[in-house]
UniProtKB/Swiss-Prot annotation:
GO cellular component, one term: cytosol
Protein name per its UniProtKB record: Bacterial ferritin
Organism the protein comes from: Paramagnetospirillum magnetotacticum
GO terms of biological process kind: intracellular iron ion homeostasis; iron ion transport
UniProt entry tagged with the keyword Transport: yes
Positions annotated to bind Fe cation 1: E18, E51, H54, E129
InterPro entries assigned: Bacterioferritin, Ferritin-like, Ferritin-like_diiron, Ferritin-like_SF, Ferritin_DPS_dom
Tagged with keyword Transferase: no
Origin: domain of life: Bacteria
Function: Iron-storage protein, whose ferroxidase center binds Fe(2+), oxidizes it using dioxygen to Fe(3+), and participates in the subsequent Fe(3+) oxide mineral core formation within the central cavity of the BFR protein shell.
Disulfide linkage: none
Catalytic activity: 4 Fe(2+) + O2 + 4 H(+) = 4 Fe(3+) + 2 H2O; Fe(2+)(in) = Fe(2+)(out)
Length: 164
């Protein structure tokens, strides 16, 4: 099915965003693992996998529309130096993705509808808003309420968990 170039271009922009988010989550998850923060490592590694699933969905949609996935204009991730900055950078990126997703959905639901692309983006938007963003906001809220040291202690998990 031949898709509109404007839709394919927007889907490619989203694809780049999902892959950069996956890269950022990948680095952050390994930093958490290195620091012994097992619970954060597991959650952020799960988020990385979600981003790769979103990228897969977008690639499949682009190919279905007879487009070519284009990740040539891929910026680098924004890697934090400590737990709060890492969570904040991840949240900032997710909020930017939400804005982009809403723009693409509005474009696809316009006068010349591309509803399958809109549906794909709506699925990603729902997961991003209700899972990723909410969780990151909760973590930053916990740090503000309980203090960084208490948060880090709770994020470490059991001592035996990190042993391999």
């Amino acid at each position: 099915m031949k898709g509109k170039k404007s839709v394919i271009s927007r889907l490619n922009k989203l694809l780049v965003g999902e892959l950069v988010a996956a890269d950022q989550y990948f680095v952050h998850s390994r930093m958490y693992q290195e620091w012994g923060l097992q619970k954060l490592y597991e959650r952020i590694d799960h988020e990385r996998m979600d981003e790769l699933e979103h990228a897969d969905l977008l690639i499949r949609r682009i190919l279905f529309l007879e487009g070519t996935p284009d990740i040539s204009k891929r910026p680098g991730p924004n890697i934090g130096k400590d737990v709060p900055s890492m969570l904040k950078n991840d949240l900032d990126y997710e909020l930017a993705v939400i804005a982009e997703l809403k723009e693409v959905i509005a474009h696809c639901e316009g006068p010349k509808r591309t509803m399958t692309a809109a549906a794909s983006c709506s699925t990603i938007l729902e997961e991003t808003e209700q899972d990723h963003t909410l969780w990151l906001e909760q973590q930053l809220g916990l740090i503000a309420r309980m203090g960084l040291q208490n948060y880090i202690q709770s994020a470490a998990g059991d001592i035996a968990q990190g042993a391999s």
